[in-house]
């Protein structure tokens, strides 16, 4: 039993629901799977050329493709990397962001396929929606995330993505004793992107509201920021950065991203 409950179950990449179990297919979450993939790729690069397919044209797919190229280059290995971007690379962002990312990838011989998505992976072959079939040694699925089925299975009100539907106080719209944050919620006042900046800003609001729900205090609203810094690590010591209307790429962008990320991680070191 409980008086209040905070649900923070995160999200997962649903790709394997439609894919066979295959040791060559890796989803980008949980992150420990990427460490295993990195170790295997480094071992394979010692004695053979690799063909790697990345499925998903969002920020994660772009970063994974770029960093795979950087990994192979650092190891003096040969690797053909193909990014299957769906309808369009970085389709939810301004064209200038897309152009910077596309230029970075293609200048390093990463093939970017737009207007197609991955349908199936079997026997080291990837079938695309445009009819093409790619040979591959590894496939990385970065096709977006979805919340756990816990909320639908429990009969709670959910948003279109299946996340627990919450109000401005991060409370379930039907059960005020239930709270939640991060990727597992659907924010009723307005749709929010599944990005870490929102999840991080949920935390102090959740703590405040959980404590005040217990002692009868005033709850605090979560007010999403209008825009947030986007910085894509391209894997070669550069980043594509968007801040409000300012967009640029280069080593300065990577230095900024590296500083912000390390500062954030340091704050939560045990």
Where are these regions (language model features)?
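Internal hydrophobic alpha-helix adjacent to the cofactor/substrate pocket in enzyme cavities
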Residues: 73, 197-225
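Short glycine-rich anion-binding loops that position phosphate/pyrophosphate groups of nucleotides
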Residues: 10-13, 145-147, 237
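Glycine-rich dinucleotide-binding loop and its adjacent helix/turn
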Residues: 7-55, 59-74
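FAD-binding beta-loop-beta segment adjacent to the flavin cofactor pocket
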Residues: 162-179, 223, 236-247, 253
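N-terminal Rossmann-like NAD(P) cofactor-binding module of classical short-chain dehydrogenase/reductase
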Residues: 6-7, 140
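C-terminal auxiliary extensions adjacent to catalytic cores
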Residues: 230, 236-270
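FAD-site-proximal beta/loop scaffold in flavoenzymes
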Residues: 23-48, 133-204, 208-209
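A Rossmann-like FAD-binding core segment of flavoenzymes
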Residues: 70-168, 218
